[in-house]
Design a protein with these regions (language model features):
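Short, conserved loop/helix-junction motifs that constitute active-site signature segments
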Residues: 115-124, 184-185
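Extracytoplasmic/secreted cell-surface and envelope-processing proteins
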Residues: 41-43, 66-67, 89-95, 137-142, ...
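A domain-level signal for caspase-like cysteine endopeptidase catalytic cores
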Residues: 25-92, 100, 104-105
Length: 553
């Protein structure tokens, strides 16, 4: 009998162990990593977290472009997610390593989040660690300008209500990096990131070591760690939480997800665009980026399908939406916004391409008449006319001789094809007025100097300049279109020993480094530069690089 009881006890114990084993395994937390750049953070987590309590999974497969989709199919469920990569532009995590090509676009993260196409992988996330610059920067990427309030008043709101609603819409549509990350990681209780510059992996690793050595691990608890935030505080680490359905941005997230959700057809997405454009135009303006982006993504194949074609035709035929949209566009304060809205109106069939050009030229005419043409206007005009689509439109602008003589106006006219404007801008580049030189810089960023004659004119003009700041700017402009003719290069070589400014000498070196050295006596020039160069106040510089280049060649 005692033997039977002993055997029965052993059997029960064995069954209990077998049943308990999956529970024990299930209790292990899974730390997933997306290592786009530095592996220091991931390796520190692996080194300090006990492997009997944590599983570690790297989601990136080198050389496999569809690594995220492949990870979604594995059945892995992450409790913790580490993402390491540069993030300065706010559009993707990327690497500066030459031996790696992997990257993680924010668009892809939004698609996965909105489509719920990867429900297992991120369904039980408790913590996300975003090791990249500005990942949780709260600065607004979009702002509500004064026309928002004017539009709401036209729609029937009182002035006070319009201002209050504009503030609310501005906050809702600000779309900072922080907002993007919160929307992507919906319902995740703890999201760590950086409001500014983040430490590189080689610096972040030791800080994480100090965190793990300072006390018991809190990783995967779903609670923000004051110890971790304290250690990274000098590096701008901050924390946020993913929104739930009660969050003030939940409605915006639902709207934005319409364009990223793979479960919706293109026709359904175009239908949502039409629904959205029936709202207050103030909100349409603040959502313009998403509308433009989706419209641009519709290829000819999509547009040619009966369902999409019919949905677009409904938008084109909506006279009320067209009238309200164009009224808002013509009242917009920022020329860039006005141009974008006119272009979008063309995409929607509300304006012909000739009418789009006419609206833009009308806008530029108003800017000239009001004396408001700025560097931003010049940049916009040159960008819009990169493909010469405004050829033949210049006669629409009736600038007076006095107006055409102002350098910002001359540059705008030059961007649109004016030969007189082009000549005025070239003279302004070497005229000594810093503001005019800045305008010329912007213009020549988009347009090339026309041959050796213009090169020589600019080079000799620079040599005669007296104002140091303007001279440096002019030289920096020339360095983007370095001369190759001997006469232009000799003008700059003669200027080098005459100037009393090390900044001017450095700027000359910047031009000569990029120029064709074939017409120069390289050994003699290297000796002359070394003999006449001014002492550098802060170590090696562009002049040293040029001297080495001349000696090597």
């Amino acid at each position: 009998m005692p033997v039977a009881r002993s055997a029965k006890f052993a059997f029960v114990a064995l069954v209990s162990f077998v049943l308990a084993a999956p529970v024990a395994l299930a209790d292990k937390k899974t730390v997933c990593s997306i290592t786009v750049n530095s592996a220091d953070e991931r390796e520190t987590f692996k080194r300090y977290l006990p492997h009997d309590e944590y599983n570690f999974v790297e989601l990136v497969e080198r050389g496999r472009p569809d690594w995220l989709a492949a990870s979604c199919r594995t059945g892995i469920k992450c409790d913790v997610l580490l993402i390491s990569g540069h993030f300065d532009g706010g559009t993707e995590f990327y690497t500066d390593r030459l031996d790696a090509r992997e990257y993680l676009p924010v668009d892809e993260m939004e698609r996965v989040a909105c489509s719920e196409s990867c429900p297992g992988l991120f369904s039980q996330l408790k913590e996300v660690y975003l090791f990249g610059c500005n990942t949780l920067n709260a600065d607004a990427l979009h702002t509500a300008s004064a026309e928002i309030v004017r539009s709401l008043v036209r729609a029937g709101y009182s002035a006070n209500d319009a201002e209050a609603l504009a503030r609310m819409l501005g906050e809702r549509h600000a779309e900072s990096n922080r907002d993007h990350m919160r929307d992507i990681f919906k319902d995740v209780p703890v999201i760590y990131g950086f409001s500014g510059k983040a430490p590189l992996g080689k610096s972040a690793g030791p800080l994480l070591e100090r965190y793990f050595q300072s006390g018991p691990s809190e990783i995967g608890s779903g609670r923000a760690s004051t110890r971790l935030l304290g250690l990274f505080a000098p590096s701008s680490m901050t924390v946020a939480a993913g929104p739930d359905e009660a969050d003030s941005r939940a409605g915006f997230r639902r709207d934005a997800c319409h364009f990223s959700d793979d479960r919706l057809t293109p026709a359904q997405k175009v239908g949502f665009m039409h629904e959205f454009m029936r709202r207050d135009m103030a909100e349409v303006r603040l959502f313009l980026h998403h509308l433009e982006k989706y419209s641009a993504s519709l290829g000819n194949d999509d547009r040619g399908t009966p369902a999409v074609s019919a949905a677009l035709a409904e938008i084109a035929g909506d006279a009320s939406a067209r009238a309200r949209f164009l009224e808002f566009a013509r009242d917009a304060d920022e020329p860039t916004v006005r141009a974008r809205m006119f272009s979008f109106a063309g995409d929607m069939g509300w304006l012909t391409q000739a009418e789009v050009r006419g609206e833009v030229m009308q806008m530029f005419g108003e800017r000239i008449a009001q004396g408001k043409v700025s560097a931003a206007d010049v940049n916009l005009a040159c960008k819009l006319n990169q493909d010469n689509r405004f050829a033949g439109e210049l006669p629409r602008l009736h600038a007076t001789p006095a107006q055409a003589a102002r350098i910002p106006n001359a540059a705008l006219l030059a961007c649109l094809g004016s030969a007189d404007g082009h000549a005025r801008v070239l003279r302004a580049l070497t005229g000594g007025n810093v503001d005019d030189v800045q305008i010329a810089q912007i213009y020549l960023h988009h347009r090339q100097l026309a041959g050796a004659d213009e090169m020589r004119m600019v080079a000799s003009g620079i040599a005669r300049m007296n104002a140091t700041d303007a001279q440096v700017r002019a030289l920096n402009t020339l360095s983007r279109q370095p001369p190759s003719d001997r006469e232009s290069l000799q003008e700059l070589v003669r200027l080098f020993p005459l100037t009393r400014s090390v900044d001017v000498q450095r700027a000359i070196a910047g031009v000569l480094i990029r120029a064709d050295h074939a017409s120069l006596e390289k050994p003699e020039l290297a000796v002359a530069l070394r003999k006449t160069r001014l002492k550098s106040p802060d170590g090696g510089d562009m002049i040293d690089v040029l001297i080495r280049q001349l000696q090597t060649n």
